[in-house]
Swiss-Prot record:
Keyword Chaperone found: yes
CDD domains noted in UniProt: Hsp33
Database matches in HAMAP family: HslO
Cellular localisation: Cytoplasm
Organism: Pseudomonas putida (strain ATCC 700007 / DSM 6899 / JCM 31910 / BCRC 17059 / LMG 24140 / F1)
S-S bonds: 234-236, 268-271
Any single Pfam family the record assigns to this protein: HSP33
Name by which UniProt lists this protein: 33 kDa chaperonin
Gene that specifies this protein: hslO
Keyword vocabulary terms for this entry: Chaperone, Cytoplasm, Disulfide bond, Redox-active center, Zinc
Amino acid sequence: MSDLPDTDFTQRFIFDERDVRGEWVSLDDSYAAVLARHEYPQPVKVLLGELMAATALLVGAMKFDGLLILQARSAGPIPLLMVECSSEREIRGMARYEADQISADATLSQLMPDGHLTLTIDPVKGQRYQGTVDLDGANLSECFTNYFVQSQQLNTRFWLNAAGGKARGLLLQQLPRDRQPDDEEREDSWQHVVALAKTLKPEEWTEGNETLLHRLYHEDAVRLFDIQPLRFNCSCSRERSGNALVSLGEHDAKALVDECGGTVEIDCQFCNERYFFDASDVAQLFAGGGTDVASETRH
């Protein structure tokens, strides 16, 4: 089978003779769409791309119907990185940063000191799950590896890369005991697949996924599953923005319009879409007329 063209997808794979599974992610267009909406400094672009790759890997690895949200927060130059990806594999991301405090060669600990990582699963049905851990690692790959070793108690490794407008990621995880009942054999097998993944060079990340996996594991029986496409999509809308005004109450919403000189502007932090509401729009919202009239948006 030939390599897939550059696109956006996740692809699961499994080692037929080992208790190990893997997941690969490639993000080109969706990552480019996020970067096109903001003028992020290079270190922010890299971290946001890596977080997007990690989020897509987790959506590909988990079984749920809903939304997965990853947030990395700190009191440093990058106070927030946030990525959302739905079970339909629609992804968006954003960052907040202090441009004058960011240097090109800054490390993760310098950009996000005393940071923490929060994973939220918001299912369509059922209870919301949220877990938070410290950003414990020299880079995001190490942080996610440490997170999942703590939470799932299964050997797990992440490799994340964002460069040249492309984001990539590789996840390896040891499966529960099945094909290899012997403890020593299981550990040797795990160390084998990890050691080969560690040989990945920065310039190899943008090669075709099948070429790369074959190069790493050509001596193993690796079975690839069907790809799962991803795409950028922002869930903001004029209706949601109008609902935010309604939640303020009629008196406060009208007062806000007056304070803003006659027009309230609501900006989407993800896609930079801007929604405008004047006094007549707000009156219509509370009269039950919805958001159909004067539905002006700007980029």
